[in-house]
Amino acid sequence: MRPIKLNLTNFGPFLNETIDFNNVENNQLFLISGKTGSGKTMIFDAIVFALFGEASTKDRKESDLRSHFAESKKPMVVEFEFKLRNQYFKIQRQGAFIKEGNKNKTLGQLAVYQYEQDDYALRESKINSGNQFIKALLGVNAEQFRQLFILPQGEFKRFLLSKSVEKQDILRTLFNSQRFEEIQKKLSDDVKEVREQIEKRYNDLENHWKELETFDDETLCEHKVISARQTNNIIKVLPDFKMKAQIIRDDFEQKKEILKNKVNSTENALNNNIKLEDALNKLNENQQKYEALLVNENEIQEKVKRVTEINEVRPITNLLEVKENTISKKGKVAQSIEEKSKSIFDLEDKIKQSNLEADNLKEKQDDIEELRRFIEQTQLFFEKANKYKDAYNNYQFTKTAFTDLEAHLTQKNEEIKDTTAKLNQRQPDYRKIEQITEAIYNLNNDIKQLKQNEKDKIEYDALEKRKMQKQRNLKDLSQKRVQLNEEYNNIDKSKLDLNNKQDVIATVQAALHTGETCPICGNEIHTLSSHVDFDEIMERHQQLTLLEEKIATVKGDIIKCESELSHIEEQLSKYTIASLENINYEALEDEVEKKYQEKKKIDEENNEIEKLKDQLQQYEKSSHDLQMNIQKKEHILKENETAINDFENTTGYKRVDEFLTKFEDAYNQIRQFDQTLNEIEQKIQNYKSTLAIEKNSVTYLKNNLAEIETEINETDMKINEEMQRIGFTSIEQVEKVTAQASEKQNLEKEIETFKKEKQSYELYIAQLKAETNNKKLDDTQQLKERFEEMQQVYETASTELSQHDYKMEFNSKKITEINKIIDELNSELQSQQEVFQLAEILAGKNEQKLTLENYVLIYYLERILTQANQRLAIMTGQRYQLTRRAQISQGYSGLEIDVFDAHSNQSRHITSLSGGETFQASLALALGLSEIVQQESGGISLDSMFVDEGFGTLDQETLETALDTLLSLKSTGRMVGIISHVSELKQRIPLILEVTTEQYQSTTHFKKQ
């Protein structure tokens, strides 16, 4: 990704600023320079905010990015154009903020555009989908982008020197290695769960095995001694439990069947005898009851006759009851007519009185209407009474505050005038500072060179002295070598090959005899005596060996001396006589001191000007704030005056409390009047409605009374006709028979009961005679005792069989469970063995004692170090390489970094590096980490990079090393920006993005040197 253009609106110190990165040519290094606090880092905050809605550091929130001097109703907006893989994109992101006068926050906005067909086309317009689009486009999240795009070297120095645990936190964030820890934890949890499950199965198996019933069988009891964990042996003996149980059950079943037949036979005999005895007893009892019932038969016949007479007189009785009810109804209707007539008279009198009350009340109608108009006109003022109270109360206070603010504004304007006069249009002369700094830099370089010449002169003289000494040593060694060669050549070298052959010759002599053929030469042996002096040969051999060693030593010394002379000559060739003689630097040091004094004087003047400008800026801001407050107070005064005038003109009152009292009194009078009038009118209406109802009721009752009299006459006629039909001559006869009507129901019930009992006895006696005919009765007690005895024996046998069946069923379930558990155990143990081993390895139980996550982090760290060493080797002349310290310990080990020194051919602690060397190692590590993160995040190509480092803390030598290192970054093919305010960097970097602060805002511009 390569930045093209960045537009900032109300962002940090930039109110309306555009940075065009097209001013930076391809692969060009440029410097971002400016005073402390001018907003250099805010440029990268803006880029990260545009892409991810966050700042370039975690410590800053989105609300901290908005300019404090932005207009309250204008948003903070960042527009960022960039190039990615030969395509152009533009992002517009607006931050959330609260407009002046609003309580709710105005939400942020996001728009993502892609350049197509000579114009930008909208791709996303919603924040969530837009963020996902950008993340997918870049292939990295905000944290990874910070590591790739901005390299804060101080952070990487801490990363370089940190312990394994600290590196682990950083690397796991960048490479999302928590997933490996989760995999390890998930696997460990699964293994733990499986092991717990297996142990639970063994416990269940042991419980089932212990609970298995042995039926007191000796063989089964011996089987139960087997341990529950010997699953193979248990499987072998389980069939014995089933077989033994079935044999015992067959015996119990046979015994029970025999006893069952005996019990059934005894029970049948007992039941038949009991039935016969009961039938005979019931036959005798029912015959006695039947004879007693027949004694009352004549009395029942008399009651039948009386019921017949009562049934004939029933119609006349009904007619008499109807007549009596009708006469009673007639009396009630006459009484109701009298009551209704009295109620009508009372209602007419009440209506007259209510009309008089209404007329008296309406005489006050005009006064009430006047009050009603007052209420309507002043209703709004009553509802907002607090507003007008506040207007009266605040008017004088606001007027006093307004006068005070005007006085303060006059005073502040005088201060602005005085400060402007002191400033006298002066501006800080930073250009002069840069020129002096450049001159000091050049003078220091010259002094450094002269001092180096002085050191070189000393080293040159030492080398010349050392050269002469080595030449003398070489001459002496050459003479010694000639002397040793002469001694070596003078020694007799004949028969030296027989040295160490004395034992062999003696062995051959012992095996041969005079006159035999020699096995070596084939001639006849004449004598076996020794004719070789082995001691003399050994002495000469030792002398030659000693001389050879001395010659080799002298030769090695000559080669070493010649090599050292060659090295000295090579070192001497680096020096020039002219530079060695130029070592006078005292005058230049005096000149540097003068330049420092001149720079100090200009710095003091610049600081004074900056202080006056800052003071003027504060005065102007205070003046602006006072003007805004005066306008606000003036607006409040006008609002209060308008409110007071409206109140007094409309209500006629100058005190709000008096108006409120008047308004509430008028309102209560109107409400009381309306309520009383409504009550009277409603009462009149109710009286009239009731009166109409009562008159209708009287008319209805009179008609009903006439109908009742007609009904009484018709009933009398029907009674006379019915008496003539029956033969009664007087009402007394009818009443006498009617008096007996209450007995009718009881008489009929007695008659019906007699008939049913008689018929029931006759049927039951006939049935019992049929059952007992020709049957013999035995002793029931003896039969019962025999049955109970057989029943008890049978129940005992049944209980024994049931108990055995239960035990068999219990054993069957247990055996099924045991087989199931053993099958599951065998399956789990076979399938989980490799998983158990894998879990232990991933948890750190391995040769390296590393967890899975730390193993992965070591892999990433080694890749980072490999990438970093490619640059570090170039930076340090192939001297240093970063290496991972190999060690074995439980936990997060193996992430410490050592440095390998090629000069000493061994590794040493990273803290042993000098400041400049540490800077080079940190920078190489930062670049290596950046490139590996790119590879892991999908191979995104970031064509630009920014290095943010406090170069002002470095000494001169380390700064030179840093500059050389940073200048070499152009070869990586990236646009590289360096953030710093160190003046020396301006002399080495030709393109500068200058960030200038003016009062409360900053501006930027590119300049070339």
UniProtKB/Swiss-Prot annotation:
SbcCD cleaves DNA hairpin structures. These structures can inhibit DNA replication and are intermediates in certain DNA recombination reactions. The complex acts as a 3'->5' double strand exonuclease that can open hairpins. It also has a 5' single-strand endonuclease activity. The keyword Lipoprotein does not apply. It comes from Staphylococcus saprophyticus subsp. saprophyticus (strain ATCC 15305 / DSM 20229 / NCIMB 8711 / NCTC 7292 / S-41). Residues 178-214, 243-309, 337-503, 578-842 form a coiled coil. ATP binds at G34, K35, T36, G37, S38, G39, K40, T41. InterPro entries: P-loop_NTPase, Rad50/SbcC_AAA, SbcCD_Nuclease_C. It comes from the Bacteria. Heterodimer of SbcC and SbcD. This is Nuclease SbcCD subunit C. GO terms for biological process: DNA recombination; DNA replication; double-strand break repair. Belongs to the SMC family. SbcC subfamily. Keywords: ATP-binding, Coiled coil, DNA recombination, DNA replication, Endonuclease, Exonuclease, Hydrolase, Nuclease, Nucleotide-binding. Pfam families: AAA_23 (PF13476), SbcC_Walker_B (PF13558).
